[in-house]
Amino acid sequence: MWVLINLLILMIMVLISVAFLTLLERKILGYIQDRKGPNKIMLFGMFQPFSDALKLLSKEWFFFNYSNLFIYSPMLMFFLSLVMWILYPWFGFMYYIEFSILFMLLVLGLSVYPVLFVGWISNCNYAILGSMRLVSTMISFEINLFFLVFSLMMMVESFSFNEFFFFQNNIKFAILLYPLYLMMFTSMLIELNRTPFDLIEGESELVSGFNIEYHSSMFVLIFLSEYMNIMFMSVILSLMFYGFKYWSIKFILIYLFHICLIIWIRGILPRIRYDKLMNMCWTEMLMLVMIYLMYLYFMKEFLCI
């Protein structure tokens, strides 16, 4: 019973955090574009996200006949994003999950299917094109992501995130494996469909992308799932390359740094062309990842690191 209560509290806190993450993003983008951002509703615009949420949820929703998949796909997307937060050690009771890295890779692999269903069931050319782009991008870059995570697992010799705390007491992977850190951050941006890799939501080409037919509460579920993934991947990146304890101030600062960096990149970089993205994956990044994997294997096997 105590575990269920802790899980419920964690999920509520994550959902509230999404609201303030959107406010932070709008504030940072506002200052990048030489404007103030939201500042009218109550104290410095702090309640702007809740006002937007009420407006979205109060909009009319049309229920179509024989449209179960149309409704369930955003729910599945939201559920998969929420389920990943089980790995977060809230009050320490989930601290020793033995195969937590494999669980994360499994959920990330499954998260492609709801977006594919959303695009296909919408019966819209723009949505279908957005979903097709997502599938091709995920097929290309999940290979790189798997090898990057496998390199780190080989270093710590474990499938659990818990080992990253003990392995990085003396030196951080962000320093020791700096090229791997940059490639991991790039793969994370692609996995999250963020600028400059947000090709499935290209406004100039696809109007709104895969979610063009969604509104009201179903759009809220898609929106929440995207921003929960941003927060979770920032947590994982901070853990795997810095190894600070979850409750430490250092971990929180590194986590906020990654969040702000993702938002800052959105404000300054243009969207990459699709063919250049595929070329970067198959001819450049995959080769670098494989070379680095062999280099780390040599270090572990012959230098006894």
Curated annotation (Swiss-Prot):
Family annotation (InterPro entries): NADH_UbQ_OxRdtase_su1/FPO, NADH_UbQ_OxRdtase_su1_CS
Reaction(s) catalysed (UniProt annotation): a ubiquinone + NADH + 5 H(+)(in) = a ubiquinol + NAD(+) + 4 H(+)(out)
Enzyme class: translocase
Membrane topology summary: Multi-pass membrane protein
Entry's Gene Ontology molecular function annotations: NADH dehydrogenase (ubiquinone) activity
GO biological process terms held by the UniProt record: aerobic respiration
Keywords: Electron transport, Membrane, Mitochondrion, Mitochondrion inner membrane, NAD, Respiratory chain, Translocase, Transmembrane, Transmembrane helix, Transport, Ubiquinone
GO cellular component: mitochondrial inner membrane
Enzyme Commission number(s) from the entry: 7.1.1.2
Main localization, broad class: mitochondrion
Subcellular location: Mitochondrion inner membrane
Coiled-coil positions: none
Transmembrane segments: 1-21, 75-95, 101-121, 134-154, 173-193, 219-239, 249-269, 285-305
Any Pfam family: NADHdh
Family in the record: Belongs to the complex I subunit 1 family.
Protein function: Core subunit of the mitochondrial membrane respiratory chain NADH dehydrogenase (Complex I) that is believed to belong to the minimal assembly required for catalysis. Complex I functions in the transfer of electrons from NADH to the respiratory chain. The immediate electron acceptor for the enzyme is believed to be ubiquinone.
PANTHER family: NADH DEHYDROGENASE SUBUNIT 1, NADH-UBIQUINONE OXIDOREDUCTASE CHAIN 1
Name recorded for this polypeptide: NADH-ubiquinone oxidoreductase chain 1
Provenance organism: Apis mellifera ligustica
